[in-house]
Amino acid sequence: MIEANQLHDLVVKPALLSLGKQFSQRAARTLIMGTIAHESMSGRFIKQVGGPALGIIQMEPVTHDDIWENYLRYKPELVNRLKLLFEINDPNVDRLIYDLRYNAVMCRLHYRRVKEKLPAADDIQGMARYWKTHYNTANGKGSTEQFIQHFNHYIAGAL
């Protein structure tokens, strides 16, 4: 498990700030921290048994590739920034296995595609619903109750 203050201060916040202030508001950082808390037990897993998802955000390869192919392809300035930040020419889903900041950025970009406004940073129930609707989806195994439980266990008090 990655200690929550360190995860936030050394990974999530600087990763999002490197994209620009419009990506790094407190609500976005809280949602990403909650996503990590639930999806990987705050960094305990980078790949779980029985599924394709990778990294501390447990993103499936098809989702990773879709962000690059159907979102970022229309945002060349952002693509250039990502290529400079991560010193990459071609995105590779395997980067989720070893690059914590890449995890934070990809998670933020996944949520950034959503038209619905982020819940307030202190609205954990709203964050749980947002995560379930836009990240885990109706077909996912996770529940809002589990999200809240994991948030309270791993993250609460650190942000």
Roles of regions detected by a PLM:
Residues T144-L159:
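Long, charge-rich low-complexity segments
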Residues I2-L17, F23, G34-K115:
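Peptidoglycan-targeting cell-wall enzymes and recognition modules
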Residues I97-V105, A121-Q125, K141, E145:
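Short, amphipathic alpha-helical segments
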Residues R26-G34, D122-W131:
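Alpha-helical scaffolds flanking conserved acidic
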Residues E39-K47, N136-E145:
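Secretory-pathway/luminal and periplasmic proteins that interact with or process carbohydrate-rich
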Residues V114-D122:
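Inter-helical turn/loop segments and adjacent helix faces that build the functional surface
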